[in-house]
């Protein structure tokens, strides 16, 4: 089993572990990077242990202009051609609301140091062609059962295959969990809905994704979405139910709005291929 590790999460989660504010003086205290490096190694080792990894992990990081520029300098040193930086395709698709428009999180002090450390010590894949690390992980896992996506990002659970979410603070670990393409919805102990596969995808098409500023359908909440999808057992049934609600809510704009929302929410599993609705009359 090969762990596919979402390092975008690690960059922030462990990055902030390298600094804190003194309660008495209010002074920002930075810890030595050696401490943080040890913390990173132990976290990755623990994740690999929890998923019973038999192969070294592959770490995924979403590209940025800064990272692409740095990698192009490295390519120049080795005589390779530079690679053009391509902005995440979802930003140009989002017309209703800016994609990730509510995120204003500052980067931890050691953010770029962690990237350098991971690239020097692990097998790191940096996303290309306007994809996010999430998409690259799903493309790697597509059609396989010998990999496991390790992330605390719920969106990745759309992808078929094995999944694991590690413990963080009061949030318990989830998995390993296996999902087929259809997937399922269930309720956690705290009452929150958790989903996998196409059921999660269609659920998000209804309720949206506040973390990424994707609105979904107006005035469709968790309870209505779960009730609509819970007892449907094929992609055709789920698509028809969601399509009908889109038409009811959005009228003549339903087709374009569905296209926008689906392209934003879909985790790319094959390069260049977005979500394709089932053909009419397909059994």
Language-model features and meaning:
Residues 23-28, 53-54, 79-88, 94-282:
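Extended two-metal-dependent nuclease catalytic cores across DNA- and RNA-processing enzymes
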Residues 1, 282-283:
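Short, Lys/Arg-enriched, disordered terminal segments
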């Amino acid at each position: 089993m090969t762990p596919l590790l979402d390092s975008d999460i690690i960059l922030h989660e462990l990055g902030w572990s390298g600094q804190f504010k003194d309660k008495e003086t209010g002074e920002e205290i930075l810890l030595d990077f050696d401490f943080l490096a040890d913390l990173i190694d132990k976290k990755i080792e623990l994740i690999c242990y929890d998923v019973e990894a038999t192969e070294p992990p592959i770490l995924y990081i979403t590209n940025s202009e800064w990272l692409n520029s740095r990698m192009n300098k490295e390519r120049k040193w080795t005589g390779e051609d530079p690679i053009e930086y391509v902005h995440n395709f979802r930003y140009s698709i989002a017309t209703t609301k800016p994609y990730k428009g509510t995120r204003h999180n500052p980067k931890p002090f050691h953010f770029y140091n962690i990237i350098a450390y991971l690239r020097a010590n692990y097998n790191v894949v940096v996303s290309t062609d306007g994809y996010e690390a999430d998409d690259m992980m799903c493309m790697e896992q597509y059609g396989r059962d010998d990999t496991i996506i390790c992330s605390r990002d719920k969106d990745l659970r759309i992808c078929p295959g094995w999944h694991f979410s590690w413990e963080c603070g009061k949030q318990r670990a989830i998995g390993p969990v296996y999902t087929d393409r259809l997937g399922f919805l269930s309720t956690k102990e705290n009452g929150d809905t958790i989903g996998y596969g196409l059921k999660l995808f269609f659920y998000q098409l209804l309720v949206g994704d506040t973390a990424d500023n994707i609105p979904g359908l107006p005035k469709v909440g968790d309870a209505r979405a779960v009730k609509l999808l819970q007892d449907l057992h094929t992609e055709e049934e789920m698509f028809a139910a969601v399509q009908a609600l889109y038409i009811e809510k959005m009228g003549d704009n339903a087709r374009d709005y569905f296209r926008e929302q689906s392209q934003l929410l879909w985790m790319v599993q094959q390069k260049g291929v977005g979500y394709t609705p089932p053909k009419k009359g397909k059994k």
